[in-house]
């Protein structure tokens, strides 16, 4: 069955009234879509609207689509009503497997087999979420970074029953909707960005627990150090450029032994030739032939 034409897609269903659901709704409204928002409890509506109203000035500053309007928001506590006419569904319900499984079971009974449903889950696996869904082939993870209306990353990965064309479609849709989708190679708990964030978070907690640094020390160290650099080049490219000519190969060959130094409470992987070559080749591909002088200037 053919999936919706992305270029003419106009209506999106957003499920969930929390910060993620509200943030997604704000983003889609700013991009000029009609948004049909499902709230489990009507009492959630004031807080949900407040999230969007808080986000809107930022979105105005960033630039709204010509057709963007808060008037294009429709709120309901009827699930079937929410998904009626929607060509894409972004699910941001409570982060509990049993509740998500129940929700996807219901969606499988009322949503067409040509509609992709993406979950904002930050840690659950789609293979588990889709277990009881009749249209599991169209279900996948579309995990944003919070707030979704400001941070462009969306991690996209399917479950055991998800079809490749559903993932292809989701990648194209998120691009169309102004996001920066990252297609994961395989389904892993926590995906990519959250696992990296969690490693940093655990190390920070260790330093505070051992009275080695205060929370303020840690945040200042990041804000005025690696965080600024990583925003420009990312972790891998920053280390690729750091050693000048020779790049990642020189970095790993020179500093590889430092992986065994007690600089972290996390175990370092073994620096095998395969790992070394994967890092070197990956950074060379990202560099795209640019000189180290040019990359350093950036």
Predicted ranges, named:
Residues 36-38, 76, 90, 140-142, ...:
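Hydrophobic/aromatic beta-strand patches that form the interior of the parallel beta-sheet core
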Residues 1-62:
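NAD(P)+-binding Rossmann beta1-loop-alpha1 motif at the extreme N-terminus of oxidoreductases
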Residues 119-186, 190, 194:
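Rossmann-fold dinucleotide-binding core
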Residues 2-5, 14, 19, 24-31, ...:
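ATP-dependent carboxylate/acyl-activation modules
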Residues 23, 148-157, 176-177, 182-212, ...:
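Active-site-proximal catalytic alpha-helix in oxidoreductases
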Residues 43, 58-116:
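Rossmann-like NAD(P)-binding element
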Residues 2-7, 31-33, 179, 210, ...:
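NAD(P)-dependent Rossmann-like dehydrogenase/reductase catalytic/cofactor-binding core
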């Amino acid at each position: 069955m053919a999936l919706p034409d992305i270029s003419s897609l106009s209506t999106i269903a957003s499920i969930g009234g929390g910060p993620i659901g509200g943030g997604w709704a704000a983003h889609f409204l700013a991009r000029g879509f009609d948004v049909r928002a499902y709230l489990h409890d009507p009492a959630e509506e004031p807080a949900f609207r407040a999230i969007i109203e808080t986000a809107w000035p930022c979105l105005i500053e960033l630039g709204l689509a010509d057709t963007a309007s808060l008037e294009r928001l429709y709120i309901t506590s009827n699930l079937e009503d929410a998904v009626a006419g929607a060509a894409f569904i972004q699910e941001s319900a409570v982060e509990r497997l049993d509740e998500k499984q129940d929700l996807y079971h219901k969606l499988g009974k009322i949503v067409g087999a040509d509609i992709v449903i993406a979950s904002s889950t930050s840690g659950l696996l789609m293979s588990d979420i889709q277990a009881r869904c009749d249209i599991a082939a169209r279900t996948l993870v579309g995990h944003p970074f919070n707030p979704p209306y400001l941070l462009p990353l969306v991690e996209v990965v399917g479950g055991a029953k998800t079809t490749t064309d559903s993932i292809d479609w989701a990648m194209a849709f998120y691009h169309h909707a102004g996001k920066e989708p990252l297609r994961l190679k395989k389904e892993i708990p926590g995906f990519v960005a959250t696992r990296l964030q969690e490693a940093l978070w655990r190390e920070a907690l260790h330093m505070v627990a051992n009275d080695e640094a205060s929370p303020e020390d840690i945040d200042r160290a990041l804000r005025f150090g690696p965080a600024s650099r990583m925003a420009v080049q990312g972790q891998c490219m920053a280390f690729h450029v750091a050693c000048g000519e020779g790049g990642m190969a020189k970095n790993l060959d020179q500093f590889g032994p430092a992986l065994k130094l007690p600089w972290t409470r996390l175990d370092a992987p073994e620096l095998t030739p395969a790992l070394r070559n994967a890092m070197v080749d990956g950074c060379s591909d990202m560099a795209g032939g640019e000189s180290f002088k040019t990359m350093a200037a950036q």
